[in-house]
A protein has these predicted regions:
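Short, intrinsically disordered N-terminal pre-domain segments
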Residues: 1-30, 449
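Short hydrophobic/aromatic-rich beta-strand motifs
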Residues: 28-43, 315-317
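Short, surface-exposed terminal/edge motifs of secreted or surface/virion proteins that either
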Residues: 40-60
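Acidic glycine-/aspartate-rich tracts in secreted/extracellular proteins
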Residues: 43-47, 140-142, 177-178, 224, ...
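Short acidic-hydrophobic catalytic motif
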Residues: 62-194, 292-296, 312-313, 421-422, ...
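C-terminal, surface-exposed recognition/capping segments
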Residues: 66, 226, 248-281, 323-331, ...
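Short aromatic-cysteine micro-motif
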Residues: 124-131, 155-319, 448
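A solvent-exposed, charged loop/short amphipathic helix patch at secondary-structure junctions
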Residues: 178-201, 339-365
Length: 451
């Protein structure tokens, strides 16, 4: 069969390419300037071929990293770094349930059910075997930086050369979402039974109660809150963690979506009934769960309740849009122009953070709002493992999708209320912040996670 003119031309090009081909040993030596030079890569899991800048390939080989990047002016979030590492990140970190002693020693719970230890023995979640916690058991580094118009959030297991590396030690927080108050010891405990979480106590009381467990125990600590949200952003490669849950993986084998809007029902304090930890016992799952239980009124009247759409992030249940949590180490100063500035400490230590004064604290940043009302920020300052609004222009369905409330006050100190309650809807989430309340305030809709 005769070839067409176009086919003959293509064959000639193939022959020409073959004749001009060189063995590796015949190639010219490359210059030491690697700018613009690429190497070819092949992903054995997806079968895809791709290219990478040589400088990035060398960086990955020396210190593998993964993460996301996004432009503050655009809603899309992109994956960067090692796809393989991001796919395996929950396993590499060993995310899941733990029983943690006051000295921070820990035993991993079974990823299939938190009623068993990973070794197969029965696990008591009532506090007798340790605090029922969720967390990770491998330290890592976090990098947050701007480059070519993008904000990057990345993690690695060794320091990345040329970047500021935040060291994240082994950590954990209340796996059921919230801690309970032990009146006998006046301390916070994490349990996994369907009990009433601590509520209607000020952060000053909660802070002291958490620290009674020993060194480096906190209530609603800012770094733990930040890291939880950051891990969700990376694993879902999505800034808005309240995006609908999607059990399907992408073609690259990555998770997508988020952990959902949050609990479908407000906790029943509005009718005088005690709130209840909505326990989900199905291990280190990534899903949206449900819960049925019974609670009581102050007069002893019982009420059956049912919650659905409960986030379960590898064993961390109901961690937002259920009960508000005021941070024990974030402090707001209300400025004369009506804006609010966030103050933190450079490091997290063994001493109590003073919530009654700015003395000794460090200015983190100032929010771009000076009028009263709920806002949806487009961007945040995320230095020092804390977040604070840096740019207006978001919405409930774009960018981070979380709310910030400025009371418009022109003087005074305020606490930072995190995460949102069951009635907050779209405002709630990992970078939700309400700056309306004083540090001595207490509400029935406020609680604490122990970390």
């Amino acid at each position: 069969m005769a070839l067409t003119t176009d086919e003959e031309a293509k064959v000639k090009l193939i022959i020409q390419a073959f004749d001009n081909a060189k063995q590796i040993g015949d190639l010219d030596l490359a210059s030491m300037d690697t700018a613009g030079q690429y190497v070819e890569l092949y992903d054995s899991l997806t079968g895809k071929a791709s290219r990478m800048l040589l400088s990035d390939a060398v960086s990955q080989a020396g210190a593998e990293w993964c993460g996301i990047r996004y432009k503050d002016a655009k809603t899309e979030t992109e994956v960067v770094g090692s796809l393989s590492m991001l796919r395996q990140l929950p396993t590499l970190l060993n995310l899941g349930g733990y029983l943690v002693q006051n000295d921070h020693s820990r035993r991993k719970l079974s990823p299939k059910t938190h009623l068993l230890l990973e070794t197969g023995e029965a696990a008591a979640l009532d506090g007798t075997m340790g605090h029922y916690q969720w967390g990770w058991d491998k330290p890592f580094y976090y990098q947050n930086y701007k480059l070519a118009g993008y904000t990057y959030e990345t993690i690695s297991f060794s320091k990345r050369k040329g970047f500021w590396n935040y060291y994240i030690p082994v950590g954990s927080r209340s796996a059921a979402g919230y801690a309970v108050y032990d009146s006998a010891t006046q301390s916070l405990k994490s349990v996994g039974t369907a009990t009433v979480p601590v509520f209607n106590k000020s952060i000053l009381t909660l802070q002291t109660a958490a620290h009674k467990n020993g060194d480096l125990w906190f209530a609603n600590e800012r770094v733990m809150n930040f890291v939880t949200g950051m891990l969700k952003r990376l694993i879902f490669h999505n800034r808005s963690i309240q995006t609908d849950f999607n059990a399907n993986l992408t073609t690259d084998g990555l998770h997508q979506g988020g952990t959902g809007l949050g609990c479908s029902e407000s906790y029943p304090w509005d009718n005088g009934y005690l709130p209840l930890n909505a326990l989900v016992e199905d291990g280190d799952a990534l899903e949206v769960g449900s819960f049925k239980g019974s609670t009581t009124n102050k007069d002893g009247t019982a009420k059956d309740i049912e919650y659905s759409a409960i986030p379960n992030f590898y064993g961390l249940k109901n961690d937002y849009k259920a009960l508000w949590c005021m941070s024990e180490n974030m402090l707001i100063n209300c400025n004369e122009d009506g804006s609010q500035s966030l103050y933190i400490d450079d490091s997290v230590g063994k001493t109590l953070f003073n919530l009654n004064s700015l003395d000794g604290h460090v200015l983190h940043s100032r929010a771009p709002y000076n009028n009263e009302g709920w806002k949806y920020p487009k961007a945040y300052n995320m230095s020092h493992l804390a977040f604070w609004p840096s740019e207006d222009g978001g919405s409930q369905s774009t960018y981070f999708g979380d709310g910030y409330h400025n009371p418009g006050s022109k003087s005074g100190l305020r606490g930072v209320v995190l995460l949102g309650s069951g009635g907050d809807g779209d405002y709630a989430g990992s970078v939700y912040a309400d700056g309306n309340d004083g540090v001595g305030d207490a509400r029935v809709s406020w609680s604490a996670f122990l970390c």
